[in-house]
Amino acid sequence: DLEKIKKYSIAKEDYKLLAQGQDVTDANGKKIKNSAVTIKGRQPHSYAFCSDTAYHLPMVPFVKNVELLYHEATFLEQDIQRANVTLHSTAKQAALIAKKAKAKQLLLGHFSSRYMDLTVFENEAKTVFENVTLALEGTTFKV
């Protein structure tokens, strides 16, 4: 908050310290709390991308509480053996990762061309995790 910074006569050299969340001192040596001269920023957005990967629970801590999780879903659960051999995931497995990670939204993509109807991926994933969207060509998403 520039008005408050001017009011406290904080040196320009200290702006970087304020941006880092640190307290500073004014020209008279008085300590100025960071919260007294700054405004709260907006919450950062988060997005994680897990593609060309087999079902791998150890990745969960790395995508914990993410807003938007893109996860490949190359196969359906009926073809889980093929998924295991080719080191890809099923829609259900992607949903399990999203659920365990407490993601807000799951975006599925990287579908095998063997499936003509892609809505089955969304339906399979929704048996585990409700907020599922298909990453279809040309679709954009806002985080």
What are these regions (language model features)?
Residues D1-F49, T53-P61, L68:
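Active-site-proximal loop/helix segment associated with metal-binding centers of metalloenzymes
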Residues Y55-V143:
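Binuclear metal-ion centers of metallo-dependent hydrolases, dominated by the metallo-beta-lactamase
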